[in-house]
């Protein structure tokens, strides 16, 4: 499975709504389920890729250089897109600055999504350091304040909801 080419074009539009369509993957294949940058990869494993929307956030949906944001987020509709049940998965593909990655995810949640039934965040890093108190506190804050558990792994995450 290879990554899609949907995000190679420039996204225009003033409002988030105008930018949303151009920031959403239009692939009609399983490429919709994967993102990859600089050797870091996230794969969403679901039975029907048509129930997934992949949205590029950084440089597409949100272009403001001063605003922190994660790289991608996925909407997954486990009961089909006609149902009101949707899950949001925030993905940051990062080198080794985990604190910065967490801050980007939190900023994206605050900016975009407040009332999603299930949220989960993922950081795929080149090197995940030993857990320290700062990282643990940020993870706990994310879980408590946004009800959003966080998974951090090196190089690749394959997630099956």
Per-range role (PLM):
Residues 111-118, 144:
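Arginine/glycine-rich "motif VI" loop of SF2 helicases in the C-terminal RecA-like domain
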């Amino acid at each position: 499975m290879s990554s899609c080419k949907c995000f190679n074009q420039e996204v225009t539009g003033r409002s988030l709504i105008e930018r949303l369509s151009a920031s959403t993957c239009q692939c009609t294949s399983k490429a919709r389920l994967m993102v990859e940058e600089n050797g870091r990869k996230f794969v969403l494993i679901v039975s029907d890729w048509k129930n997934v929307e992949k949205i590029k956030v950084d440089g597409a949906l949100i272009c403001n250089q001063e605003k922190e944001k994660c790289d991608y987020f996925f909407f997954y509709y486990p009961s089909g897109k006609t149902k009101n049940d949707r899950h949001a998965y925030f993905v940051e593909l990062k080198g080794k600055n985990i604190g910065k990655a967490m801050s980007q995810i939190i900023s994206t949640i605050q900016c975009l999504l407040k009332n999603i039934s299930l949220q989960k965040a993922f950081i795929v890093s080149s090197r995940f350091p030993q857990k320290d108190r700062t990282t643990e506190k940020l993870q706990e804050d994310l879980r408590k304040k946004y009800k959003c558990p966080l998974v951090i792994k090196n190089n690749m995450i394959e997630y099956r909801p």
